[in-house]
A protein has these predicted regions:
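Structural boundary/hinge residues at secondary-structure and domain interfaces
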Residues: 17-129, 169-204, 243-271, 275, ...
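N-terminal export leaders
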Residues: 3-7
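Surface-exposed interaction/gating patches
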Residues: 180-239
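Short, solvent-exposed coil/turn segments at beta-strand boundaries
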Residues: 92-94, 103, 123, 136-143, ...
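A conserved glycine-rich beta-strand in the N-terminal activation segment of trypsin-fold
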Residues: 131, 135-193
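Hydrophobic lipid-interacting interfaces of membrane-associated proteins
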Residues: 149, 235-237, 279-281
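Short, surface-exposed beta-strand/loop micro-motifs that present aromatic residues
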Residues: 31, 85-88, 131-137, 216-220
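Hydrophobic h-region of N-terminal signal peptides that target proteins for export
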Residues: 11-17
């Protein structure tokens, strides 16, 4: 279950928040002002918009991304009930997990202390953790977890005009339609990013191949099955062809290895479209609700199919 849950957000990483205004995904301003200026990757999940969907109930409610795992363990908060929006950021070396919700801060902080986490006062804020990692609350609606030294820098710099999405990353985010409840954007390549993808899966193989991409976006609509769209921009036409052919190769081998008595798997492979347009590779898939389970199993199954 945990591995299946990781698929949807891992796909988003390989390429929040509610689309309330405008045509692109909406990032809650109180979260955006916390994003460091050196951020190269951002991913968002609008939990409120997908809480009642079958995919969330089956998979995303069990998701445990690396930074999210730390946050849940530290605070005891339940993503299924306590969080409304999630944002994950990285500069390629370190990153933050940010969340919006309605928190009983006093009760949570008391629990943190009972769990043995030290209270670290800093510039009017209380950090709970140790000298390596900590979590803090900003008011009763915003929580941030990450490396303790980075949290202190965030506090020092949060009101500076340089904070917020960097221009290149903002431009990428603005291309993601507001009907995508799970989304991500990155600039400057994927090297050094922890994508959280199972290495011994088909998706893990593709993730390894995508290290040469310069920038890209992913958006997933979960309201009626899985509607996935990824736009990947490479450094050269040759890089794009290599990635295009590699993804097509994984799909092709998967089709060839599908038993005759599993026609539903052929349907799944046929939903995946890969197109190269000069330096850009577009990947899309529209999976009907009755095939969601099989789609997740397909891309997380053990063993690597090599093109």
């Amino acid at each position: 279950m945990q591995r299946r849950a990781a698929l949807l957000l891992s796909m988003a990483i390989l390429a929040g928040c509610r689309g309330q205004k405008g045509k692109s995904v909406f990032i809650e301003p109180s979260l955006e002002t916390l994003i460091p200026a050196d951020t190269i990757f951002v991913a968002g999940v609008d939990v409120d918009a997908i809480r009642s969907t079958p995919v969330f109930q089956k998979y995303l409610s069990q998701v445990r991304l690396p930074r999210m795992e730390d946050f849940v363990q530290q605070t005891g908060l339940d993503p299924r009930k306590d969080l409304s929006q999630i944002l994950s950021t990285s500069n390629g070396k370190t990153g933050f997990f940010m969340a919006r919700g309605q928190f009983d801060v006093a009760a949570v902080e008391l629990k943190l202390q009972k769990n043995g986490l030290a209270q670290i006062p800093y510039s009017g804020y209380n950090l709970f953790g140790d000298q390596r990692r900590a979590v803090m609350f900003i008011g009763s609606r915003t929580a941030v977890a990450g490396p303790t030294p980075d949290l202190k820098i965030l506090i020092d710099e949060r009101h500076q005009p340089t904070h917020g999405l960097p221009p290149a990353l903002r431009q990428a985010v603005q291309t993601i339609p507001n009907n995508r409840q799970v989304w991500a954007a990155f600039v400057g390549g994927l090297r050094g990013l922890d994508l959280g993808v199972p290495e011994d899966s088909n998706l893990g193989q593709i993730a390894h191949l995508l290290r040469g991409i310069d920038h890209g976006t992913i958006g997933i609509d979960l309201r009626n099955g899985v509607d996935f769209k990824g736009d990947l921009d490479c450094n050269t036409d040759i890089d794009a062809k290599h990635i295009h052919d590699a993804i097509r190769g994984v799909i092709g081998i998967g089709r060839l290895s599908t038993p005759d008595n599993r026609p539903e798997l052929l349907r799944l492979y046929d939903t995946i479209k890969v197109e190269q347009i000069q330096k850009r590779v577009d990947v899309s898939a529209q999976v009907a609700p009755d095939l969601e389970d099989k789609f997740l199993d397909l891309w997380l199954k053990q063993g690597r199919a090599r093109p």
